[in-house]
Amino acid sequence: MINYVYGEQLYQEFVSFRDLFLKKAVARAQHVDAASDGRPVRPVVVLPFKETDSIQAEIDKWTLMARELEQYPDLNIPKTILYPVPNILRGVRKVTTYQTEAVNSVNMTAGRIIHLIDKDIRIQKSAGINEHSAKYIENLEATKELMKQYPEDEKFRMRVHGFSETMLRVHYISSSPNYNDGKSVSYHVLLCGVFICDETLRDGIIINGEFEKAKFSLYDSIEPIICDRWPQAKIYRLADIENVKKQIAITREEKKVKSAASVTRSRKTKKGQPVNDNPESAQ
């Protein structure tokens, strides 16, 4: 029998522990982001080597408590409270912060979207129609008609834009398993933040506020659905997303084949061997 009284006590202990841990991290951080409600989030902390073991012990405690709380499903604790768990980056030579666009995603069915639109339309009409609300309702009705073209269980992804988050460019030392031939490795700073051990941080940390747009997104090739009900969101059909992913995979494989053929041709040329650019002619 599951002891939910103990589970509730453990949950309260975890929340207090987590909040204090994050508060201390924010207080000593070299950089923090601000959430939409003003809360400090994503602390980036340079950690003295001598404190690494003690912080790791606290992270391990966080992990164990979170896993134990998963054994109490009836408490309905959101996973976003338990996870993610903070991390310590080791073997880092240099790190630079930069900003990128943050996107929150949620999947919904066409039926769910229609339901939410209908609910909003009823609210707008009950409050009285003016010029602004009439245009708003017209936009919602157009989106509703579009959604009615699909089965109710057709899935869509809603991507909410409009805010930024911190990323890191991390250069690891050559003996690190994360070493990337001297090139930087991108690291997404989660809401719980990240610690960077200073043992090998000989080139330090650079706090850079520049905004960097992603070079490519598979969503760039899909026409989104725009609805005034969600002014900062773009809506995509999940089937369209999967089709683009498949096409990207095919293109990637074709490039690999061409690259391999190019290497083979180059080697044969160097050796003075004949090169057949039309293999079918040899059949």
From Swiss-Prot:
Does the keyword field hold DNA-binding? yes
In the UniProt entry for this protein, what further remark is given in the free-text comments?
Answer: Thermolability of the mutant P1c1.100 seems to be due to an alteration in the C-terminal half of the repressor.
DNA-binding region coordinates: 30-49
Stretch list, region Disordered: 254-283
Write out the function statement from the record. Answer: Sequence-specific DNA-binding protein required for the establishment and maintenance of lysogeny. This protein recognizes the sequence 5'-ATTTATTAGAGCA[AT]T-3'. Binding to the operator DNA of c1 repressor is sensitive to N-ethylmaleimide.
Origin organism is Escherichia phage P1
State the name under which the record lists this protein. Repressor protein C1
Asked if Transcription regulation is a keyword of the record, the answer is yes
Fetch the InterPro entries from UniProt. Answer: Lysogenic_reg_DNA-binding, Repressor_C1
Gene (name only): C1
Keyword set for this entry?
Answer: DNA-binding, Repressor, Transcription, Transcription regulation
An example molecular function term from Gene Ontology annotations: DNA binding
